[in-house]
């Protein structure tokens, strides 16, 4: 028998290890290169391959478990395979990536106290803007990923293939859209394509309003929303790197780790709050868990499921549009880098 305490300990250790790996990995792009256009390529590659990895893991896990005996030992073996593969990829990253950003003025700089570092971080207005964008990107996946299964089961009365088909369709369109964004970033800029993408995502969700009980309209909405959100997914990590340079320019303090860590915390908190709000709203509407043996839901719960799926993505698109409306860092970046180059040549951050 496995105790609840043992399971909790395992989860804590796993999450600590994940955080210890993910934060340095996330900030690595700002330490590898300072050219914004090159960071754009890294961001596109990272965000384009990430959903593919999720699809591979999701589609291959159960077949592998069945192939290896379909018992507890089979699950352990399959998880071990994924762990070894992940370790191999991390080692590849470790040996092949090089931190080429070396700033002599930074080596001479004394370590600053934590309050000073936090004050500089909180005074960086673009940190808040990009953290909000990173958070809503994460929340958008939480909303659709949480509500869509309920929608397919209770509104479309299908808990077999519809959710998988919609999820796969939206994910594949998102991946293709992310890679298509690479030349668009170079021509139009990160902010501009993400800003237009927000309107496309908004339009796709409004399209769904025309007939929220039609599977065809659901497919069109998923495809349009994925096209609209692809630009933000493509550029968000490159934007975080730009924020690092802006922070150094504004405060004479370079904060790669703190900026990426702060953004990461925002996404985790945002996704957690979104899940809690969704759960709370469903409970308040009278939703009854299927584990209780009840397959029918009260009308209020069905209306809540429809409302959450209708208005959640609308809110996400609105936040993206409003945030990017005042985002001017793309225009400022060349002048910022020129001034930083001159300051660093004189031994200043």
Spans of features found by a protein language model:
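Single conserved hydrophobic/aromatic residue that forms the stacking wall/gate
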Residues: 1-13
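Intracellular loop-helix junctions on the cytosolic face of multi-pass helical membrane proteins
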Residues: 9, 21, 25-149, 153-154, ...
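Helix-loop junctions at membrane interfaces in 12-TM secondary transporters
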Residues: 9-10, 209-222
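Glycine-rich segments within core transmembrane alpha-helices of 12-TM secondary carriers
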Residues: 43-62, 262-282
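Residue-level signature of mid-helix packing/kink "hotspots" within the transmembrane helices
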Residues: 55, 171-179, 272
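Transmembrane alpha-helical segments of major facilitator superfamily
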Residues: 82, 165-174
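Helix-to-loop junctions at the C-terminal end of transmembrane segments
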Residues: 176-190
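Structural signature of the two symmetry-related core transmembrane helices
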Residues: 192-207
């Amino acid at each position: 028998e496995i105790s609840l305490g043992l399971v909790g300990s395992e989860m804590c250790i796993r999450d600590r290890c994940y955080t210890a790996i993910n934060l340095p990995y996330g900030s690595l792009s700002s330490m590898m290169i300072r050219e914004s256009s090159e960071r754009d390529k890294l961001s596109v590659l990272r965000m384009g391959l990430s959903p593919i990895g999720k699809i591979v893991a999701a589609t291959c896990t159960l077949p592998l478990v069945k192939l290896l005996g379909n018992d507890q030992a089979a699950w352990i073996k399959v998880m071990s395979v994924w762990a070894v593969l992940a370790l191999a990829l991390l080692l590849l990253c470790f040996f092949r990536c090089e931190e080429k950003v070396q700033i002599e003025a930074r080596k001479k700089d004394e370590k600053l106290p934590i309050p000073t570092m936090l004050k500089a971080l909180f005074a960086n207005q673009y940190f808040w803007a990009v953290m909000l964008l990173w958070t809503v990107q994460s929340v958008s996946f939480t909303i659709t990923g949480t509500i869509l299964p309920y929608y397919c089961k209770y509104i479309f009365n299908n808990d077999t293939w519809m959710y998988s088909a919609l999820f796969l369709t939206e994910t594949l369109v998102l991946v293709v859209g992310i890679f298509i964004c690479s030349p668009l970033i170079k021509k139009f800029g990160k902010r501009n394509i993400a800003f237009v993408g927000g309107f496309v995502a908004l339009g796709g969700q409004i399209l769904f309003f025309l007939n929220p009980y039609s599977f065809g309209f659901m497919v069109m909405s998923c495809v349009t929303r994925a096209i609209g959100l692809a630009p933000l997914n493509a550029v968000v990590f490159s934007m975080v790197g730009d924020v690092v340079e802006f922070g150094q320019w504004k405060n004479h303090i370079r904060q790669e780790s703190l900026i990426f860590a702060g953004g990461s915390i925002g996404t985790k908190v945002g996704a957690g709050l979104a899940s809690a709000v969704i759960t709370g709203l469903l409970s308040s509407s009278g939703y009854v868990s299927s584990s209780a043996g009840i397959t029918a839901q009260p009308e209020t719960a069905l209306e809540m499921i429809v409302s959450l799926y209708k208005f959640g993505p609308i809110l996400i698109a609105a936040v993206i549009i409003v945030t990017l409306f005042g985002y001017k860092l793309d225009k400022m970046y060349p002048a910022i880098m020129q001034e930083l180059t001159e300051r660093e040549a004189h031994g200043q951050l």
